[in-house]
């Protein structure tokens, strides 16, 4: 458990812009992580490979903890007068679980064209985003500016922990997608 007591108002590079960029990720990650879990779990029953089934369970567990820890960081934002819940609710309704959200509209539309196409597309989106996240995670460890001197230690600890787990499970969604539908077009359609 990372302590988020006394997080500096401009805890990234001493910059309001850089800090708010990172803060926005703390707001986006909880619903995004839940979307990733939903998109992978939809196909867990179709997976035959026992090792991959274990990897899926581990992935879902890690993503759930990521969501919780980033949402826990919101307390530091509240203390600074920020209101992360407003944007999180907006994001949830428009992108994820609202009746006319991107997730529901695209899934329903694509499933009309071909059974499970919407679910496969969501899995493809998850695969692409997990790939990008792993690239950013890897860069975080090699970026000279990503030090306690430039980033509040609490923020850096949370980001390093999350980054290490992203690197650890970076191939799980790709492996699930390849087992569910090995279509190259599906894989690259969202890249």
Q: Where do the language-model regions lie?
A:
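Non-heme di-metal
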Residues: 1-191
């Amino acid at each position: 458990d990372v302590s988020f007591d006394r997080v500096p108002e401009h805890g990234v590079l001493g910059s309001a812009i850089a800090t708010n960029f990172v803060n926005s990720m703390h707001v986006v990650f909880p619903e995004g992580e839940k979307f990733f879990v939903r998109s992978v779990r939809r196909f867990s029953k179709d997976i035959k490979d026992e090792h991959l089934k274990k990897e899926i369970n581990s992935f879902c567990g890690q993503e759930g903890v990521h969501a919780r820890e980033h949402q826990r960081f919101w307390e530091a934002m509240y203390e600074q007068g920020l209101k992360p819940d407003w944007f999180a609710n907006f994001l949830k309704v428009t992108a994820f679980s609202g009746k006319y959200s991107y997730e529901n509209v695209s899934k329903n539309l694509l499933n009309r064209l071909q059974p499970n196409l919407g679910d496969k597309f969501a899995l493809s989106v998850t695969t692409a985003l997990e790939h990008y996240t792993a690239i950013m995670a890897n860069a975080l460890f090699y970026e000279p500016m990503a030090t306690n001197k430039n980033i509040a230690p609490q923020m850096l600890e949370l980001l390093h922990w999350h980054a290490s787990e992203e690197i650890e499970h970076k191939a799980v969604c790709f492996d699930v997608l390849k087992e569910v539908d090995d279509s190259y077009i599906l894989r690259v359609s969202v890249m």
